[in-house]
Amino acid sequence: MPALILPLVDAATHWPERGGLVGLDLGTKTIGVAVSNPDRRLATGVETIQRKAFKQDAARLLAIAAERKVVGFVLGLPINMDGSEGPRAQSTRAFARNLANLTTLPIGLWDERLSTAAVERELIGMDVSRAKRAEVIDEHAAIFILQGALDRLANLRTGNG
């Protein structure tokens, strides 16, 4: 049976109380990957996958999930500023559907609006060279996406969200 694909808050009801999550920033050429610790407080970068064919990309993601013993995925969904979904969001949903056919780990979709831009500004502020930014931007965007999702889930648990 394929994995569930749900908005983050709904997906969280299908994840065990503890267990890490894999966060993904899906680009056309790369996939930024981050993971959380088991109590879901902190996101850290893992790697940037150079996209090849879906099966190869998915195999690497599933290997990371197995190595880290995670309980689900958080996939950044690129929503337009007006709240609509354009071609990138549709492509992300298609990727999620294809990944869901290969795993039972629930997939939570999280609004990633402006995540890459925010990370780019942060890296520029840290005086990271353009070449180095290009190497790390997607992994850092995955960290940003996953940490935002973790913070939202923490706020819901404490009644602040």
UniProtKB/Swiss-Prot annotation:
SMART domains: YqgFc. GO terms for molecular function: nuclease activity. Its EC number is 3.1.-.-. One of its GO terms (biological process) is rRNA 5'-end processing. GO terms for cellular component: cytoplasm. It is found in: Cytoplasm. Keywords: Cytoplasm, Hydrolase, Nuclease, Ribosome biogenesis. Could be a nuclease involved in processing of the 5'-end of pre-16S rRNA. Belongs to the YqgF nuclease family. PANTHER family: POLYNUCLEOTIDYL TRANSFERASE, RIBONUCLEASE H-LIKE SUPERFAMILY PROTEIN (PTHR33317:SF4). This is Putative pre-16S rRNA nuclease. It comes from Bradyrhizobium diazoefficiens (strain JCM 10833 / BCRC 13528 / IAM 13628 / NBRC 14792 / USDA 110).
